[in-house]
């Protein structure tokens, strides 16, 4: 089936290694992740980050080619002990003494921390030297998109060639921001970092975002709506990366964006400006319906009638939304980018159609999960769309 663009590239990378007749392929499966400011029970990568290693190895049948897959399961949300346990298990397979493996693991972790601190320090130093007329472009994407020239389509070099300073999301203190009150159920750490970065960029008049999303990425389809809300009236360039991109088309979009920035008025920073002092707009999505407003339930198959009856027994004026119509779907698609999975514009369109019929205050039931697929973000994103 169709996968996101980064997973397609993993297929290619592994095939290259097969052609080189390697003995081992190291590709971890990342189950949970870590974000210091997150308040969700667990943080997750996408489903592909959890399953790509094993599924691709099976699809390419690497075992029959004499290649061993080394794919420890990383539960970064469970702390250092879980990480150590996953990595130390490789020492037996590779015939490496555990103390040697533990030392390498510790050295690697320390190197990552030093690098993270150094990059943020570098970004802070750059921002301190800016003149009012300076315009800095911030590349917004996940870490692997920053370093892979195929995933970023050479855009950093194209921007540098045109005389602009370019930094990455890692140069900004996004990890220090606590946005949990605004995004209670955002279980993607990279999503938390991207939206924190959006707040910082929107707040600083000299910073402008170049936001790279990946074709076929479920989380990106949701984050794009929230990113747009964060940027408000500030212009930014968003490019969806896939294998069909045209270099000429990318250059045309870049030059149009840069030309628009040249016409932006110069804004002088206040002397007491603090980058991290951004607006946090709490957004609480209640789990229990109120009795003062009608409650509309989306189509849930045979459960719709049961849930409607249950809520009515609790004193809530509950109703089932009509079955999806072509008009409702068109309303949903008008508010989306055509990259979202079909259930999202269908659900959104049903709500918008009902609001057309009766614009009075109402409640809509949108069940949500706590990881790791995109549907767990539907409620928050629909709230953002309704707030436009």
Model-derived features with residue positions:
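An N-terminal assembly and electron-transfer interface module characteristic of large anaerobic redox
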Residues: 1-388
């Amino acid at each position: 089936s169709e996968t996101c663009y980064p997973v397609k590239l993993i297929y290619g990378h592994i095939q290259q290694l097969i052609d080189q007749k390697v003995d081992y392929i190291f590709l971890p499966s990342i189950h949970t992740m870590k974000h210091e400011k997150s308040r969700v029970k667990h943080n997750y990568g996408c489903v592909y980050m959890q399953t790509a290693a094993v599924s691709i190895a099976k699809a390419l049948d690497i075992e029959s080619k004499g290649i061993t897959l080394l794919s420890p399961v990383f539960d970064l949300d469970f702390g250092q002990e879980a990480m150590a346990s996953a990595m130390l298990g490789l020492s037996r397979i590779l015939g490496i003494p555990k103390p040697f493996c533990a030392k390498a693991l510790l050295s690697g972790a320390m190197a990552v921390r030093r690098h993270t601190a150094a990059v943020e320090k570098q970004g802070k130093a750059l921002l301190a030297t800016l003149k009012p007329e300076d315009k800095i472009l911030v590349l917004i994407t996940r870490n692997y998109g920053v370093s892979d020239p195929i995933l970023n389509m050479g855009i950093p070099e194209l921007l540098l060639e045109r005389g602009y300073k370019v930094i990455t999301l890692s140069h900004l203190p996004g990890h220090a921001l606590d946005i949990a009150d605004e995004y209670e159920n955002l279980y993607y750490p990279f999503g938390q970092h991207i939206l924190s970065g959006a707040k910082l960029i929107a707040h600083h008049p000299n910073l402008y975002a170049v936001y790279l999303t990946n074709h076929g990425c479920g989380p990106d389809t949701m984050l794009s709506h929230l990113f747009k809300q964060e940027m408000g009236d500030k212009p930014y360039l968003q490019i969806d990366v896939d294998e069909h991109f045209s270099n000429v088309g990318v250059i045309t979009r870049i030059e149009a964006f840069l030309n628009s920035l040249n016409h932006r008025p110069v804004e002088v920073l206040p002397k007491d400006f603090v980058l991290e002092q951004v607006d946090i707009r709490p957004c609480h999505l209640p789990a229990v319906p109120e009795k003062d407003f009608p409650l509309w339930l989306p189509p849930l198959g045979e459960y719709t009638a049961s849930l409607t009856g249950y809520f009515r027994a609790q004193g809530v004026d509950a109703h089932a939304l009509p079955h999806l119509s072509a008009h409702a779907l068109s309303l949903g698609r008008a508010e989306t980018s055509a990259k979202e999975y079909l259930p999202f514009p269908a659900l959104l369109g049903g709500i918008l159609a009902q609001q057309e019929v009766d614009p009075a205050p109402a409640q809509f039931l949108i069940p949500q999960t706590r990881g790791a697929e995109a549907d767990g973000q539907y409620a928050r994103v629909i709230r953002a769309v309704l707030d436009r």
